[in-house]
């Protein structure tokens, strides 16, 4: 039995060092296509964001344990409440000062969010001193305009719960390549 315990400890140490990396920061990617369609994707530590939205007065560990153990229907209700609050706090202004309508919101599924909370809860019991390394979750939205000049400059307003966020924006260059033909010069 002692031999197996030693192997487990060694394998755990290897796995921990192999997965050690810098903490991923919250970030947003804005992609403008055809001058009229803007896609927004937010990559966030969703369990921490939910904690700040739903119960900032509680310790994170308590919040995680409580929500990880909730019945799925109850958790779904809490999650929808948080999504409404976050969605109302996310805004985008155009260069002319008008607000852009953000539509087609896509949020992480309740089952995946609760699974992430359950994983974090298990880690807090098994290895409380270790930092959680789960993947960030995505929140998506779209904006569109019939006027190509509307999206030349935009300003984002983000909820405080997102913390500091790195924003990457770009307008991809797209070309079609016919079968068997070489592409035109691709510039970077």
Short names for language-model regions:
Residues 15-17:
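N-terminal signal peptide c-region/cleavage motif recognized by signal peptidases
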Residues 2-11:
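Sec-dependent signal peptide recognition
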